[in-house]
Amino acid sequence: MMASYPEPEEAAGALLAPESGRAAKEPEAPPPSPGKGGGGGGGGGSAAEKPDPAQKPPYSYVALIAMAIRESAEKRLTLSGIYQYIIAKFPFYEKNKKGWQNSIRHNLSLNECFIKVPREGGGERKGNYWTLDPACEDMFEKGNYRRRRRMKRPFRPPPAHFQPGKGLFGAAGAAGGCGVAGAGADGYGYLAPPKYLQSGFLNNSWPLPQPPSPMPYASCQMAAAAAAAAAAAAAAGPGSPGAAAVVKGLAGPAASYGPYSRVQSMALPPGVVNSYNGLGGPPAAPPPPPPPPPPPHPHPHPHAHHLHAAAAPPPAPPHHGAAAPPPGQLSPASPATAAPPAPAPTSAPGLQFACARQPELAMMHCSYWDHDSKTGALHSRLDL
């Protein structure tokens, strides 16, 4: 296969027409993006200045407020005017207004470089003007709101301490006025005095309550002696004559101590009086407990049948030729209607003492009386 070479005419044509090759390469340049659009350099510059509405501006809230105030005609704006400027300048803030508007209010109130100026005409129109502090005019370097200088706070003297010679309401408050007190030489002027306060009420000095005087030592000794006497009366018993004498004697020394002692000594028993008056004396001893009941009596004294057996004479011996009847038969000498032996008189001193101490002895069951009753019933049956 033979190699083909270009003809001289073609090579010469390529060397003689370099400009035509450049013109052919120019259409290969990338076309401009549709976002930027054509229309000359002026259109591209305006598109670069307009921010993207979907992107948050890189400025702090302090910078946004300062920017709005500086670009206003009077160098001051109300809160609503600041809101309108930020929304018109940065469309990003058209949504979620509640969040960033609260931040704007907080920065206006807490930052010292913003000064509140009241409106003319009093309270007829709502809202106040906000302006920049002259000392903070250059807080942004050369108009660059992204870089903020550190500002030194202006020196403010600390509030003076309260002094007795100065009134809290100022000179107007000391004079009894009802207007707003101004800070002067006579007062601080922090508060406006109320209308109902008068100069006489503010200038009067009210005395402090005095502490009670201590009780003298002699009164303490008398109270201790009265407590000891009341303890002795309580130990003796409420019904003893010594207790009544002690209660009468307590009325004298206790009356000098206080009204409680006088009332208690007249109406309460000695034990209760002692609980109040025994300030310095020893504690009162409790009354002794009552004695325990005696144990059941083990028959130390003879019963009535014992006394009757001891006092009855021995039986008389039988006559000549008379035989003693058997145990189950009655004697002819003894009538059938013979009454049972009478009980012994209760005039014996031992029996009276036993019944007085133990009444249950008189009602105690005894086998002797059962035997006599059975014998009497047997005699009545035999007589029938």
Curated annotation (Swiss-Prot):
Residues 298-308 have a biased composition (Basic residues). Residues 56-150 bind DNA. Gene3D superfamilies: Winged helix-like DNA-binding domain superfamily/Winged helix DNA-binding domain. The modification Phosphoserine is found at residue 33. GO terms for biological process: anatomical structure morphogenesis; apoptotic DNA fragmentation; cell differentiation; extraocular skeletal muscle development; ovarian follicle development; positive regulation of apoptotic process; positive regulation of DNA-templated transcription. It is found in: Nucleus. It comes from the Eukaryota. Transcriptional regulator. Critical factor essential for ovary differentiation and maintenance, and repression of the genetic program for somatic testis determination. Prevents trans-differentiation of ovary to testis through transcriptional repression of the Sertoli cell-promoting gene SOX9. Has apoptotic activity in ovarian cells. Suppresses ESR1-mediated transcription of PTGS2/COX2 stimulated by tamoxifen. Activates SIRT1 transcription under cellular stress conditions. Activates transcription of OSR2. Is a regulator of CYP19 expression. Is a transcriptional repressor of STAR. This is Forkhead box protein L2. The lineage of its organism: Eukaryota, Metazoa, Chordata, Craniata, Vertebrata.
